[in-house]
């Protein structure tokens, strides 16, 4: 499981020029799954994300988590996080989980974030969307469950 996390002032998802989800501040998460991901992977990543200390304290050090600070989450499915560009000019997405599995894991991930007490807005799984993010910092962090569990 990969999550591209961005601390944001605001973020929104639109389809056909209509905003379908938006948050005023917190985290925007672009979320991708691979074949080996499980519900346990999802649980681990959800807990990791809500506990990450990526907001500044009064000393301007990243020392405050979203759980401590408050804020919302915009979660957007993003199978292209598993793009393989090692050969040729066209990306391959064979490392991405099949749609049915990825959608179930994505729904579970969003449920875990909501159970942790956050407002969770989402995109539409598998749809073409326009995502607007006003990144704060900018702070952008790539989380990879395989790398984190080594």
UniProtKB/Swiss-Prot annotation:
Lineage top rank: taxon: Bacteria
Localization per Swiss-Prot or TrEMBL: Cytoplasm
Gene Ontology BP, a term: D-amino acid catabolic process
Extent of motif Gly-cisPro motif, important for rejection of L-amino acids: 137-138
GO CC terms of this entry: cytoplasm
Residue ranges the record marks as coiled coil: none
Keywords: Cytoplasm, Hydrolase, RNA-binding, tRNA-binding
A molecular function GO annotation: D-tyrosyl-tRNA(Tyr) deacylase activity
The UniProt record lists the keyword Cytoplasm: yes
One Pfam match: Tyr_Deacylase
Main location: cytoplasm
EC number in record: 3.1.1.96
Cross-referenced InterPro entries: Daa-tRNA_deacyls_DTD (IPR003732), DTD-like_sf (IPR023509)
Catalytic activity: glycyl-tRNA(Ala) + H2O = tRNA(Ala) + glycine + H(+); a D-aminoacyl-tRNA + H2O = a tRNA + a D-alpha-amino acid + H(+)
HAMAP family from the UniProt entry: Deacylase_Dtd (MF_00518)
Domain writeup: A Gly-cisPro motif from one monomer fits into the active site of the other monomer to allow specific chiral rejection of L-amino acids.
Complexes and interactors: Homodimer.
Family the entry assigns: Belongs to the DTD family.
Main function: An aminoacyl-tRNA editing enzyme that deacylates mischarged D-aminoacyl-tRNAs. Also deacylates mischarged glycyl-tRNA(Ala), protecting cells against glycine mischarging by AlaRS. Acts via tRNA-based rather than protein-based catalysis; rejects L-amino acids rather than detecting D-amino acids in the active site. By recycling D-aminoacyl-tRNA to D-amino acids and free tRNA molecules, this enzyme counteracts the toxicity associated with the formation of D-aminoacyl-tRNA entities in vivo and helps enforce protein L-homochirality.
Protein name according to UniProt: D-aminoacyl-tRNA deacylase
Taxonomic placement: Bacteria, Bacillati, Bacillota, Bacilli, Bacillales
Primary gene name: dtd
């Amino acid at each position: 499981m990969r999550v591209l996390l961005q601390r944001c002032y605001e973020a929104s998802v639109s389809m056909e020029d209509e905003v379908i989800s938006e948050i005023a501040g917190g985290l925007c998460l672009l979320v991708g799954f691979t074949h080996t991901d499980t519900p346990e992977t999802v649980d681990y990543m959800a807990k990791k994300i809500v506990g990450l200390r990526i907001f500044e304290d009064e000393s301007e050090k990243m020392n405050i988590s979203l759980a401590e600070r408050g804020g919302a989450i915009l979660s957007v499915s993003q199978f292209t996080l598993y793009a393989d560009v090692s050969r040729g000019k066209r990306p391959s997405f064979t490392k991405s989980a099949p749609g049915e599995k990825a959608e179930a894991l994505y729904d579970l991930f969003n449920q875990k974030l909501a159970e942790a007490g956050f407002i969770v807005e989402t995109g539409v799984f598998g749809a073409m969307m326009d995502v607007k993010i006003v990144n704060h910092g900018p702070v952008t962090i790539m989380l990879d469950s395989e790398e984190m569990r080594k």
